[in-house]
């Protein structure tokens, strides 16, 4: 999967006036590309409001890092559960009309979740870093900042708001950027969940040093279709190597019932990231409990 960054279009002068012309290649080719291009512009606005030097200083007063990876590996469940807090998605729209991020995270905690994932993207998922901070203040579980991270600024932003782990999506990052951002996260004491969608991306990630946590996203981010076979296929091909190297595998998306957990567990996943199926339940705490008990 190849995701382009937004191309720069030089201004064209006509007399004293300048125009910004748009060519055919200035339009994003898919949903993920659209999100990435919007994120680049959003980052420019963040940097104007809060320069990196000031943001880095804020991380010094951030709450102590919790052990995200340890929580997954020490889970009392056959498959560790990362329960996701998000209000909406580009493919499904608003998922929960009575959305209360703190109450939702607390319900997940009561239900037996091992960690919480918090969507912070505002434009496409109606999330925020404020939600992350509020959840950190009220919930004892380790937190994953679910964001479309393009550079170190967002990792510092996540840490300043209380995150213990960050998501790094292989499809939108070069190998050099992945390696660098993993080091930044490690320097801050945070875990990096490196997400892949196909065998090519998984092989890229396995060629990097220091990878401890790999997420296999069953959702194709080009068209948002979900297939659990993605986890099964990749672990059939590389599961032995992942296990030999001690890498914890998280199966992401498409988990709706205990049978789905059992299926990805059999394939070799040690944890699952679950969002939509929990968000649509009247009682998210019971939903987490049923999911775990159904394995």
Curated annotation (Swiss-Prot):
UniProt pathway: Amino-acid biosynthesis; L-tryptophan biosynthesis; L-tryptophan from chorismate: step 4/5
Cross-referenced Gene3D superfamilies: Aldolase class I (3.20.20.70)
A single MF term (Gene Ontology): indole-3-glycerol-phosphate synthase activity
EC identifiers of the protein: 4.1.1.48
Catalytic activity: 1-(2-carboxyphenylamino)-1-deoxy-D-ribulose 5-phosphate + H(+) = (1S,2R)-1-C-(indol-3-yl)glycerol 3-phosphate + CO2 + H2O
SUPFAM superfamilies: Ribulose-phoshate binding barrel (SSF51366)
Record key words, sorted: Amino-acid biosynthesis, Aromatic amino acid biosynthesis, Decarboxylase, Lyase, Tryptophan biosynthesis
Family matches, as InterPro entries: Aldolase_TIM (IPR013785), Indole-3-glycerol_P_synth (IPR045186), Indole-3-glycerol_P_synth_dom (IPR013798), Indole-3-GlycerolPSynthase_CS (IPR001468), RibuloseP-bd_barrel (IPR011060)
Lyase listed as a keyword: yes
Disulfide bonding pattern of the chain: none
Chain segments annotated as transmembrane: none
Single Gene Ontology BP annotation: L-tryptophan biosynthetic process
Family: Belongs to the TrpC family.
Protein name per its UniProtKB record: Indole-3-glycerol phosphate synthase
């Amino acid at each position: 999967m190849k995701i382009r960054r937004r191309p720069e279009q030089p201004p064209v002068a006509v007399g004293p006036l300048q125009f910004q012309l748009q060519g055919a290649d200035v339009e994003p080719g898919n949903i993920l590309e659209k999100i990435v291009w919007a994120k680049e512009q959003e980052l420019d606005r963040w940097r104007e409001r809060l320069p990196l030097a000031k943001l880095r200083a804020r991380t010094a007063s951030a709450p102590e890092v919790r052990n995200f990876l340890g929580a997954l590996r020490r889970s009392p469940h056959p498959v560790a559960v990362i329960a996701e807090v998000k209000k909406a998605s580009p493919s499904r729209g608003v998922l929960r009309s009575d959305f209360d991020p703190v109450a939702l995270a607390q319900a997940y905690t009561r239900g037996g979740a091992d960690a919480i994932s918090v969507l912070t993207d505002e434009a496409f998922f109606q999330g925020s870093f404020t939600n992350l901070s509020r959840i950190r203040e009220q919930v004892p579980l380790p937190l994953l900042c679910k964001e479309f991270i393009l550079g170190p600024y967002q990792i510092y932003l996540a840490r300043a708001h209380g995150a213990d782990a960050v998501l790094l999506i292989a499809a939108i990052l070069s190998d050099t950027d992945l390696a660098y951002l993993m080091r930044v996260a490690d320097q801050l004491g945070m875990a990096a969940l490196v997400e892949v969608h196909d065998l090519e991306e998984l092989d890229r990630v396995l060629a990097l040093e220091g990878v401890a946590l790999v997420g296999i996203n069953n959702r194709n981010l080009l068209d948002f279709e979900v297939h659990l076979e993605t986890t099964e296929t990749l672990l059939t091909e590389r599961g032995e190597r992942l296990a030999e190297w001690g890498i914890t595998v998280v199966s992401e998306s498409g988990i709706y019932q205990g049978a789905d957990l059992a299926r990805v567990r059999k394939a070799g996943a040690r944890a699952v990231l679950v969002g939509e199926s929990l968000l649509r339940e009247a009682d998210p705490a019971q939903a987490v409990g049923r999911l775990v008990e159904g394995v």
